[in-house]
């Protein structure tokens, strides 16, 4: 700068600087998720997709890991940057428990490997171009995955959650193919998971749903946790209150009631009648109670076989002989219907299938009455 005047180079530098700053703020500030809300969404996805990985592993006969969720909020106008390659989109609508939908997105090459494994192939050299048979196989795999996820979400939110059969379509944002499946909301939440299938796939699988639906999930999660805390606190208060008045009063009153009749009986014969036998009668019931307890302890160590029956079906010999890897057997129970819990091959209860870490489990929902158990023995 000379004589308080800017040189041409300085003017150009200022113009270039202002131009670059004007190009940056393209996305306006909008409602976003806090760090705690992102963690909540990630935890929901972690639990639900943990069970989905188990279901997919059973279908593909491969080790499946779905881990490390990453939560981001993206505007719909930038969806092409988030999905630059051809994908396969699976649309899932909630029919009970929640009102909304989400989009499950996998790379087209990964979907081709999954489809090849589903129809009995080895997954190697799978053709990325998906036909109707391959799309149907992917749809069935995603149906099993999302069904398991809905069951896990029912456990997390303490209410029944059900979904409609998923719809599969090719998604290519650059060519505007399948974009009608993307939610119309301006702001979308993308939850990305690492997907590993044996030695064949090491990629990612993504969930996409509206920001408003994510807020509903978080709100329901917080409400279910607060309700559980209230349920655990209330029984403690009601249980402690009767202990204080009940324990001292009955012990004092019977002694006062027993003494007057004994004194009336001793008015004529005070010497021969004494209360000493009462002390021996107090010890006799205790000894009688302890004996069966020891006998019961011996029975409590007997192991019993517990079986959970998912369902049954009948097939002809021809159909059995035609079974191969990837075949699907339809059972006589509907999805979400309680399963039977058997002890030594006898039904004693009903429950819901849950996933505990990497293992299946059953939450008991109904215990059969004694009359029902007797009827099952006939």
From Swiss-Prot:
Its Enzyme Commission number(s) read 3.-.-.-
Q: Name one Pfam family in it.
A: CheC
Region listing for Disordered, in residue ranges: 225-271
Q: Where is the composition biased (Low complexity)?
A: 255-264
In Gene Ontology terms, what is one molecular function of this protein? cytoskeletal motor activity
Broad class of enzyme this protein falls into: hydrolase
CC per GO annotation: bacterial-type flagellum basal body; plasma membrane
Q: Which cysteines are joined by disulfide bonds?
A: none
The record's listing under InterPro entries reads: CheC, CheC-like_sf, FliN, FliN-like_C, FliN/MopA/SpaO, FliN_T3SS_HrcQb, SpoA-like_sf
Q: Where in the cell is it found?
A: Cell membrane
Q: Write down the membrane topology.
A: Peripheral membrane protein
Please provide the Gene Ontology terms (biological process) for this protein.
bacterial-type flagellum assembly; bacterial-type flagellum-dependent swarming motility; chemotaxis; dephosphorylation; regulation of bacterial-type flagellum-dependent cell motility
Ordered alphabetically, the record's keywords are:
Cell membrane, Chemotaxis, Flagellar rotation, Hydrolase, Membrane
Task: Give a yes or no for keyword Hydrolase in this entry.
Answer: yes
Q: What does this protein do?
A: Component of the flagellar switch. Binds CheY-P and increases its hydrolysis rate in vitro. May function constitutively to remove CheY-P around the flagellar switch to maintain an optimal level of CheY-P whereas CheC may function after addition of an attractant to cope with increased levels of CheY-P.
Q: Which family does it belong to?
A: Belongs to the FliN/MopA/SpaO family.
Protein name per UniProt? Flagellar motor switch phosphatase FliY
Task: Please spell out the taxonomic lineage of the organism that makes this protein.
Answer: Bacteria, Bacillati, Bacillota, Bacilli, Bacillales
């Amino acid at each position: 700068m000379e004589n308080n005047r800017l040189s041409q180079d300085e003017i150009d530098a200022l113009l270039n600087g202002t131009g670059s700053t004007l190009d940056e703020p393209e996305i306006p500030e909008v409602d976003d998720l806090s760090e705690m809300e992102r963690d909540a969404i990630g935890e929901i996805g972690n639990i639900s997709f943990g069970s989905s990985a188990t279901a997919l592993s059973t279908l593909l006969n491969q080790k499946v890991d779905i881990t490390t969720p990453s939560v981001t909020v993206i505007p719909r106008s930038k969806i092409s940057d988030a999905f630059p390659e051809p994908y396969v989109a699976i649309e899932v609508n909630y029919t009970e428990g929640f009102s909304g939908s989400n989009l499950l997105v996998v790379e087209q090459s990964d979907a081709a490997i999954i489809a090849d494994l589903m129809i009995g192939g080895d997954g190697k050299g799978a053709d990325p171009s998906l036909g109707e048979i391959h799309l149907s196989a992917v749809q069935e795999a995603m149906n099993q995955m999302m069904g398991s996820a809905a069951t896990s979400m029912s456990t997390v939110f303490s209410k029944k959650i059900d979904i409609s059969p998923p719809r599969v379509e090719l998604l290519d944002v650059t060519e505007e193919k399948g974009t009608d499946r993307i939610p119309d909301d301006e702001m979308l939440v993308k939850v990305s998971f690492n997907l590993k299938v044996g030695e064949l796939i090491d990629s990612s699988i993504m969930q996409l749903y509206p920001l408003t639906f994510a807020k509903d999930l978080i709100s329901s999660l917080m409400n279910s946790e607060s309700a559980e805390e209230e349920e655990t606190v209330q029984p403690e208060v009601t249980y402690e209150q009767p202990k204080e008045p009940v324990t001292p009063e009955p012990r004092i009153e019977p002694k006062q009631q027993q003494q007057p009749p004994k004194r009336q009986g001793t008015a004529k014969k005070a010497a021969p009648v004494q209360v000493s036998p009462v002390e021996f009668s107090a010890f006799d019931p205790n000894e009688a109670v302890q004996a069966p307890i020891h006998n019961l302890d011996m029975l409590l160590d007997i192991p019993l076989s517990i079986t959970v029956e998912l369902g049954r079906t009948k097939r002809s010999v021809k159909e059995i002989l035609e079974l191969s890897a990837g075949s699907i057997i339809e059972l006589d129970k509907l999805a979400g219907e309680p399963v039977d819990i058997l002890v030594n091959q006898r039904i004693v209860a009903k429950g819901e299938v849950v996933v505990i870490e990497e293992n299946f489990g059953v939450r008991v929902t109904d215990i059969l009455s004694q009359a029902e158990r007797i009827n099952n023995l006939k």
